[in-house]
Each structure stands twice: as structure tokens, then as C-alpha cells.
Amino acid sequence: MTLPPLETMMSKNPNLTLTGPDLAALLCSRVCHDVISPVGAINNGLELLDEGGADADAMDLIRTSALNASVRLKFARLAFGASGSVGASIDTGEAERAAKDFAAAEKKTEVTWSGPRAIIAKNRVKLLLNLFLVAYSSIPRGGTIEVTLENPELDAKFKIVAKGKLMRLPPKFVEISTGEVEEAIDAHTIQPYYTVLLADECGMTLGHGATSEELTFTADVIAA
């Protein structure tokens, strides 16, 4: 099935107005939000042990929650953090492993990844992972996500296709990327904001499209 033309955004998006301190604060809030649930579950498991509860159930809860927290922190380190020195490059294989582990921890979405493995600019990897998060949020009941990389070292193109029940283009991502934001950015909307900011920094155009069967998210290098 041929998708309709993707809606795109050009560089220097007028919505990108957050100061550095505000951006850092909101990203920190986002990371804390992502890990507080599994960390809280670990604490619950320890309380069960203290109260003499079923050791097997408590240990299973602790083990599963610790894995979930670890996976989320590793993903956040690549997607939001410095992950090395300023200007460093990152292996796309690390991004693939982080994305697959992230989805596997919740056991509701299958991720396939295709394209050449390469060492590319850090911000491109961060953009790829944040675009993955946008796609992941578009299928809240789970499903499949297909990630395709083309020529990642030069005139890169990233394409992510999401399929699942109750799929929907994330409204805040659409608003921010098309310049139609009506509400202030907060901890719940900072991730799509950061995705658009990364695309701007990388000189890449974002696109999105939808059919009854799938949602498509793209990032392409802007032609000189």
C-alpha cells in the first residue's frame, strides 16, 4: 500500500524556544518518571521479603523490576544523555540493542531493525532513538515497530513504521513538528519536543504519515 505524502517540517522550528536550564530540567523529570515505577516495584518486593512474604514471588518482582529499570536507564543514557564526550560518535548497533531491550522489557511490542551498521554522529543516534520513542507511544496496546536505516553516515534517512491496535499519531509530536503548539511544554511533552529539537540540530526533516494499517515516521537529511 502506498502511503500518502508525508507531512514535513523544516529546520529552525519556531516552537523550539525552551532555555537550556528548562530543557535540562524537563528531560530530568521525564527520565525520573520512566524509572520511578520499576524502582518503586523493587521497594515493594523488598517489603514483601521483610514481612515474610513468599520469597519466590518477591524475588521475581525484584528481578523483573530491576531489569526494567536497568533497560530504561540504558536507553535514556543514549537517547537523552551525553553518552561520551561532546561531538562523539556512536555505533548504531548500540541503538538497536537499546531499542529492542526497551520493547522486550514490556513484552508487548516486537521490534525489527534493518540497514547498515555504522558509527555515526551522536545526535543522529539520539534522534533515531527519540523518533523510536514517538513511534512506540503511538501504539499503546503494543504491536510491531520496523526501523529502517538508509545511508546513516552521510545523507541519512530513518524510517520507522508502527502497527498495532488503537494506533494514533501522537498529537503533541504533530503539533510541535508542524509549528502549531497551543500549550506550554511540560514533562509529559518534552520528549517529542526534544525529538524535533534534535532533528533541527542534525539538519534533518521530520515526516509523519498514517493509513488504516500503519503509522510512519521519517527523518531525512535536508538537501543542501
Stretches with model-predicted labels:
Residues S85-A105:
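Short beta-to-alpha transition helix within the HATPase_c
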Residues G203-A210:
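Glycine-rich ATP-binding loops of the HATPase_c
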Residues T211-T218:
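Glycine-rich nucleotide-binding loop
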Residues L16-L26, D57, K108-Y136, P140, ...:
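Conserved short strand/loop->alpha-helix "switch" segment adjacent to the catalytic nucleotide/phosphoryl-transfer site
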Residues G20-L27, V35-D91, I119, N123:
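Histidine phosphotransfer helical core of two-component systems
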Residues T2-D22:
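Conserved signal-transmission helix
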Residues P152-P192:
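Glycine-rich/acidic phosphate-handling loop/turn and adjacent ATP-lid/helix
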Residues A25-A54, N123-P152, Q191-E201:
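Conserved ATP-binding N-box helix of the HATPase_c
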